[in-house]
Amino acid sequence: MCIRDRLGIDDILRPDMTELCDDYIERVILPDGMQKIGRLCFYNCSRLSVLELPSDICDVDGDAFMNCTKLYMLVMRGSPKDKSCLKQILSQISTLVRVRWAVSDGNAIAQACFFEYDQTYDEIGPAHIFKLNMNGEGFRARQAFMDRVFVWKQYDEIFSEAIAQESEDDLLDMAFYRLIYAYELSKEARQQFLEYIVNHKKRLSELIIRKRDSGLLQSFLELKDDEENFIADVLAVTDMLALAAQDEWSEGSVILHRFKKENLSVSRKRRFEF
């Protein structure tokens, strides 16, 4: 499909064309060289789920993402070390959203999960003076920036508090992707994420099989603890095989059987006859 660089007024006003807005948009890829996302740019794009953009966009006007209730993934083309408008975007999205940084060939190098949060107001004075309350660790996660650069250490530090407030699935999302990409991941942060994964291995197994994503499955099977032991032990792999069979996911079953045979098989003891 070829799109012309320039459209005349007759093209724009054709009656058989539909305006590209609202719930017609599900995924948008913004080109390199863009400098600004204008006011109300994606207003009422209620089915927009994925937005890919260059990390060097420098400005985002207010309410650009109003009513984008299904936006769950931002893909930043560039390095997490780049200065970006990400904080401005996140400040306009209070629902759960993931951010993935990818290089030019599309390969991901880091991913973060920003939990949902909500705002409430308490009246504390007779002259309509209100106190703003932020509920949820998602707000704190969105403040993990310094000079427009995302600060991983600050982001990782919210996890211990988030355990008491956020759902198991969302916490597994945060922990799992931090371990997979391990971008600027300290030893202490890695330990806390590993501990959570080990204690919630069964649920993580269910989520991975449900997604039917061979890449995610392979990443999980490759995870090791500090003693170089696989996180996926015999019991976990056996449970996942049962789930894959139940879900009729043959590719996942093949990967699991191969991993079990190559890494978890107990060597047969020699038998001596006297």
Predicted regions, residues:
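Structural signature of tandem-repeat unit edges
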Residues: 1-36, 46-59, 69-180, 188, ...
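Surface-exposed repetitive/solenoidal architectures
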Residues: 8, 185-190, 212, 270-274
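Short low-complexity, flexible loop/linker segments enriched in glycine and/or proline
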Residues: 66-67, 88-91, 246, 251
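Hydrophobic/aromatic side-chain positions at a characteristic register within alpha-helices
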Residues: 208-212, 245-248
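Charge-dense, extended regions
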Residues: 219-221, 242-274
